[in-house]
C-alpha cells in the first residue's frame, strides 16, 4: 500500500514473514510474475493493521492461518524497489500457525517450498537471503531489505 500525502513522496508499506515448521525449515514462495523465491507477504491494504495484513497475505500466498502472534523482527527500507517502500518483517513459529487446507498454487503463486535456512536455494531474492543469514548468524539486522 502507498499513502500519498499532498506535496510529498508516497510512503509504501508491506509485510513478509519467515514461517517455520517443526523441522526448523522456512517457507518460501515463487510468484508467477517475478523471478526468485520470497518470504510470503505483500502490501498493507487501506484500513488494515500490519498484523491483519500479514495474516491475509499468508493465507492467500501460502495457505497458512495464524493461530498465535507473529514475532516482530523489524522494518526495512526497500528503496531499491521504490524510494519510500518499507517492509515489516516477522517470524512465525511452528506452534503459531496451521494449514488452511487450501492450495494457493494458481494465478499468483507457482511454487511453495520449505528450505533449511542454512542452505537456501540459489534463486532466493537478495532481501530474502539477507534475512535468512541473519536468522542463522544472529546479530543486528541490516536496515535495508
Predicted regions and their residues:
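Acidic, metal-coordinating catalytic segment for phosphate/diphosphate chemistry
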Residues: 1-16
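Residue-level preference for beta-strand/loop junctions
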Residues: 11, 68, 84-86
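Short, well-ordered beta-strand micro-motif
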Residues: 19, 89-93, 113-116
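Conserved Nudix-box catalytic region and its N-terminal flanking loop in Nudix hydrolases
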Residues: 21, 25-61
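Nudix hydrolase/Nudix homology domain
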Residues: 36, 106-145
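A short coil-to-beta-strand element that immediately follows conserved catalytic motifs
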Residues: 65-74
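Active-site-adjacent beta-strand/loop module that shapes the phosphate/pyrophosphate-binding cleft
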Residues: 76-101, 131, 135
Amino acid at each position: 500500500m502507498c499513502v500519498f500525502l499532498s506535496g510529498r513522496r508516497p510512503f509504501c508499506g508491506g509485510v513478509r514473514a519467515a514461517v517455520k515448521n517443526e523441522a526448523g525449515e522456512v517457507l518460501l514462495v515463487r510468484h508467477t510474475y517475478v523471478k526468485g523465491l520470497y518470504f510470503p507477504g505483500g502490501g498493507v491494504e487501506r484500513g488494515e493493521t500490519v498484523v491483519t495484513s500479514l495474516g491475509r497475505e499468508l493465507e492467500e500466498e501460502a495457505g497458512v492461518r495464524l493461530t498465535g502472534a507473529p514475532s516482530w523482527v523489524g522494518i526495512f527500507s526497500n528503496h531499491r524497489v521504490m524510494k519510500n517502500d518499507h517492509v515489516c518483517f516477522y517470524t512465525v513459529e511452528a506452534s503459531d500457525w496451521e494449514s488452511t487446507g487450501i492450495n494457493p498454487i494458481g494465478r499468483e503463486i507457482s511454487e511453495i517450498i520449505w528450505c533449511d535456512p542454512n542452505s537456501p536455494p540459489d534463486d532466493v531474492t537478495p532481501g530474502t537471503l539477507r534475512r535468512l543469514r541473519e536468522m542463522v548468524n544472529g546479530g543486528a539486522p541490516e536496515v535495508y531489505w
